[in-house]
Amino acid sequence: MQRIIQFFSQRATTLFFPMALILYDFAAYLTTDLIQPGIINVVRDFNADVSLAPASVSLYLAGGMALQWLLGPLSDRIGRRPVLIAGALIFTLACAATLLTTSMTQFLVARFVQGTSICFIATVGYVTVQEAFGQTKAIKLMAIITSIVLVAPVIGPLSGAALMHFVHWKVLFGIIAVMGLLALCGLLLAMPETVQRGAVPFSAVSVLRDFRNVFRNPIFLTGAATLSLSYIPMMSWVAVSPVILIDAGGMSTSQFAWAQVPVFGAVIVANMIVVRLVKDPTRPRFIWRAVPIQLSGLATLLLGNLLLPHVWLWSVLGTSLYAFGIGMIFPTLFRFTLFSNNLPKGTVSASLNMVILTVMAVSVEVGRWLWFHGGRLPFHLLAAVAGVIVVFTLATLLQRVRQHEAAELAAEK
């Protein structure tokens, strides 16, 4: 018995904490991906307008912005552990509450509360991983977490489409609530504490000062711009693709689910390449090799749909190529933005996520407007413009990171 206890205590941080975080993150993804094939059915069940379908995603993202300003500084002061555990509890209750919704408004409110899981996971959970492990190990562990979690967008639509042939869509949220409860138990048992509680008092003045310092940091600003813009091609596709492929394209929910597999599968493959084959994912040479892949995907989106229009081929192929390219470097960009400064990491992470989620929520609404008022090409043009700008912000980010590292080395000498 003592050996069993010793086994679990030794592996709590290195194994069971990442597993619990993965389950929490996986469940949060499923609230969108499992229901996306049936989101048109949800709208019809509540007798709402079909144009509200993408709002399920945009309000989820808005929920992800709601508490960022509080959770980062709070976790810097009272600890990462109590904040993340509270988030898992709120998420579980919000998923269970969806079972009781009777209108589209209630459903969207529940989606907003579910979206707060982004605040807790990204602001507190990912930072804990980065703090608990060294640079290369943390990057590779984040790549593993991302790969496993992104199975949700692959199997989520397929599973959701299959399950909705047998059960009501609300049952899916009941399943996710159970997953959230299991993640909550895992975090209670295994999550480490990586900050000293009470080292800095919590006050409005100190919080505002930390945020001011973050938003004055040039590396943070460049990294936040790079990361947020790089999300736009994929998030706009995730949000608007049900309308494009099911409502306008005539696809069945099963066909729609299969059409999403290449996009998220590309990110998973990219992350596995980083974990298994790349010795140092922070090398500029490796990072720049991913850029032509991203640009080829964006070119495919526009040229394919312009020259040989197809209901899904060029959209899926182009988005998949882009996803593969950005998936190879995303964990590294996150690490650069978070740790290339001496600022409180919870506040840095909160600031980063506020920027990313604001850009994502706005891009979803802009993408929806472009689709309904301009069609396929203007919609994909949004992704192309964002992807091209990323190349320039990435170059600036790498230059500033090199300057920061050189300054640190000089200071040590």
Curated annotation (Swiss-Prot):
Sequence intervals crossing the membrane: 15-35, 52-72, 82-102, 107-127, 141-161, 171-191, 226-246, 255-275, 290-310, 311-331, 352-372, 377-397
InterPro entries referenced in this protein's UniProt entry, alphabetically: MFS, MFS_dom, MFS_trans_sf, Sugar_transporter_CS
Residue ranges, Cytoplasmic side: 1-14, 73-81, 128-140, 192-225, 276-289, 332-351, 398-413
CDD domains the UniProt entry points to: MFS_MdfA_MDR_like (cd17320)
Alphabetical list of PROSITE patterns matching this protein: MFS (PS50850)
Assigned GO CC terms: plasma membrane
Gene Ontology molecular function, alphabetical: sodium:proton antiporter activity
Major site of localization recorded for this protein: membrane
GO biological process: response to antibiotic; xenobiotic detoxification by transmembrane export across the plasma membrane
Subcellular location(s) of the protein: Cell inner membrane
Activity regulation comment: Efflux is inhibited by the ionophore carbonyl cyanide 3-chlorophenylhydrazone (CCCP). Activity is inhibited by extract of milk thistle seeds and reserpine, a synthetic plant alkaloid.
Keywords: Antibiotic resistance, Antiport, Cell inner membrane, Cell membrane, Membrane, Transmembrane, Transmembrane helix, Transport
Side of membrane Periplasmic, spans: 36-51, 103-106, 162-170, 247-254, 373-376
PANTHER family assigned: MAJOR FACILITATOR SUPERFAMILY (PTHR23502), MULTIDRUG RESISTANCE PROTEIN MDTM (PTHR23502:SF10)
Record protein name field: Multidrug resistance protein MdtM
Taxonomic placement: Bacteria, Pseudomonadati, Pseudomonadota, Gammaproteobacteria, Enterobacterales
Gene this protein is translated from: mdtM
